[in-house]
Amino acid sequence: MTHIEIDGVPPAPDQLWAAVSAYGHFTAMQVRNGKTRGVALHMRRLEAANREALGVGLDGERVRALIRHALGETKDASVRVYVFEAPGEPAIMVTVKAPAEMATPQRLQSAHYQRPDAHIKHVTTDQGHYRRHAQRNGFDDAILVSPPGVVSESTLANIGFFDGSAVVWPDAPMLHGITMQLLEGELARRGLPSRRSTVRVRDIASLDGAFLCSARGIAAVTTVDHMSLPVESQGLSTLAKAYASVTWDSI
C-alpha cells in the first residue's frame, strides 16, 4: 500500500488531483534501515530543478523532515519526493511504497524518443508509453535514442557501457542520475575511469557489455534489440563492488 503526504499531512482528494496534474519535478530513492544513498545529491537535484522549473529555491532540511515524517516507523521503503506548482509556494508530496530492487538482467528495445529538458527528473507519459511498448514485445524496458540513433538513457535509468578500459556514459541529453553520480566517484577511487562519449545503437555490439543503474540498483543488460551482450566481465564485477561500497546516509 502507498502512503502519501503533501506538506506533511494526508492529502484531500482535490489536493491529490492537483499534485498528479500540476507542473513539477521529483526525485526517487530507496530507503533501508531509515537511510538512503546520496541524500545530499537528492537535495541538490531538487533545489536546482526547483529554481529552474518553478523559479524559487527549496529548503532541503524541510524536505528531509517531510520524508522522515512520511516514513514514520517504516525502515525500508521506496520513496518519491514530488515538488509541484501550487498557490503561494510549491507543495511537496512524499510517497512511501514497499522497497524495490531492479530486476536483472535487462533486455532493452530501442525507441526513437528524446525526453524534453532531460536534465530534470520530471514525469512524462511518453516514457511510460515506450516502456509498455517494449514490454509488450518481450523486453524489460526501452532505451531512448535520438533519430540519428544516438543512445541517451532508458525510460527509468541511466545506461552505461564497458569498452575494455573504461565505463562509457552516453554523451547525449539525459538525466545525470544520483546512482550514476555515486558510481562515478567510487569507480574513480577504484582506478576504473569513466568518460562521456557518443554511443550509437549500431556501436553497442562492439562494446564489452552494458548496464542500467538507478536508485533501485544495478542490472546487467543482456540484449538490445537483436544484439546479445556479454554479462560476465571484470567491469561488471568492479561496478557491483563500487556500488556496494556507497555509504548510506541518514535522512
Label the predicted regions.
Residues M1-H69, F84-I251:
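Helix-start/capping segments and mature chain N-termini
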